[in-house]
Amino acid sequence: MIGKATFSVLPILALVLFSLPSRASNPVQSGFDLPQPNGCHPIGTRTVVLKDRQRGRDLLVTMWYPAAEGTSATAPYMDKKTADALAAEWKLQPDFQRLVRTHARPQVPIAEHGPFPVVLLEHGSSVVPAIYTVLAEGLASSGFVVVATNHPPDSLISVFPDGHELRFRPYWPVEADRRAQGVAMGKFADEVLVADVRFVLDQLHEMNSQNHFWRGHLDLSRIGIVGHSMGGTTAALATQEEPRILAGVNLDGSTYPGMNADVRPVPVHKPFLFLATEEHAAGDSRAREYVGSDSNTYYVVVTGADHMSFTDARLISSRFTRDLKPDLNAFERALLTSTLTRSLVEEFFAKYLKAAVAPDLDLVVRVDKK
């Protein structure tokens, strides 16, 4: 549950101010545990490689899921090669990943009381799925199977089990104006990333019927999708275009001039939640894009957040930035936004994939088009 809240309702936007947790883990120690998940399920995790031979794409997919009880060691936050790439990009201390403790155990059996609804998790540009671990573990503990695809060349790095790597490279005209870049990024989202989503969904159907581990555990009649930044754009497009997806969440997703207008009509006619920073919410065009729906649509501005606050990034950087002392205040602010994001997303999917009550989500503005 989220802490006490006060809010004021503007014509379209809800500004929601949530209180800080009464106590936060101290990041000035040698390491720290990621925030404790809200749900009651133990968590498991495993990684699979999906080969799309028709398109010549190998996709590294990490899955978090409700697990059977057990006492085995928890999974590493990320592998060393991925951590080294992220440390170079974000100027983090070497081997920072060794000091971050997760809650998921690798390769453990899935809980027997399924099948469980599925949530696809889409990363932003030049990052990796592991920086959404707080969100993924929270959803898994609440009874969802989370499926996070690493999309080359949009991800910072993909490290495959056989050791080969794929690195980020721009897929837009770097020297072009903002509109031209936006159109190119929108086309990539629609033609590559959404196609990846469809392929992964197809593979999940096969895994649910043939694969020994997953067989019968995935409820593929209840599928949602959540994405951040470019992944948020992907989530919006996939929710709109893919009939198997029932509900979607966009975490401060990219909307460059012309991106969506030149690719697909924008309105999403399904339940949709948009969490935005104040910077992204400054213009009302973004609000009109996402509230132009005939279904339950939520548009929430998280005050004080920046674009990376919806990930684990600020938790990590406040503790492990190279050559700087840990910043406890920054850590607490990051903890607030991270747990707020997780709680709202969990309640949204509980409401629209499980028909559960959502007391905190219902505090924010809901737009119902009649």
Task: Give the residues covered by each predicted segment.
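Alpha/beta-hydrolase active-site loop
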Residues: 159-217
